[in-house]
């Protein structure tokens, strides 16, 4: 069975060595506490979700695809997508950069955007 290994080291290199994102975040009072460990934790957990939940859906996505009921105009996603999306939302991935007052995690967009480069984009 195929597997997916997220390029975490590459992503960490870009965030920390190329962009030096934590230096810029220190200039923003609301994100001054976002450090390299926090960024790495988000990348690692996002990578787990991508490889363990999202990536395996490629098979059902390719084999089943979406179906359209022409009478009701409803689209049905392939097997597993609804459950994976529920896990995506339950895990807080959809609200990483949203205001905590509204259920978000308050992370800077630069950090929350990184998970979109992983196969989780299949679920959004």
Per-range role (PLM):
Residues 10, 120-121:
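Intrinsically disordered, low-complexity regions enriched for glutamine and histidine
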Residues 114-120:
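Conserved small/polar residues in nucleotide/adenosyl-binding loops
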Residues 75-113:
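Non-catalytic terminal/interface segments that mediate subunit docking, oligomerization
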Residues 1-69, 75:
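Extended, charge-enriched "interface" segments that sit outside catalytic cores
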């Amino acid at each position: 069975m195929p597997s997916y290994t997220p390029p975490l080291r590459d992503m960490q290199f870009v965030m920390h060595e190329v962009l030096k994102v934590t230096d810029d975040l220190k200039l923003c009072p609301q994100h001054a506490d976002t450090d390299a460990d926090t960024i790495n934790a988000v990348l690692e957990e996002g990578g787990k979700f991508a490889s363990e939940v999202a990536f395996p859906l490629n098979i059902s996505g390719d084999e089943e695809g979406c179906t359209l009921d022409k009478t009701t105009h409803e689209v049905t996603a392939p097997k597993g997508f609804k459950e994976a999306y529920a896990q995506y939302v339950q895990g807080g991935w959809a609200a990483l950069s949203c205001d905590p007052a509204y259920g978000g995690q308050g992370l800077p967009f630069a950090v929350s955007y990184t998970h979109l480069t992983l196969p989780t984009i299949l679920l959004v």
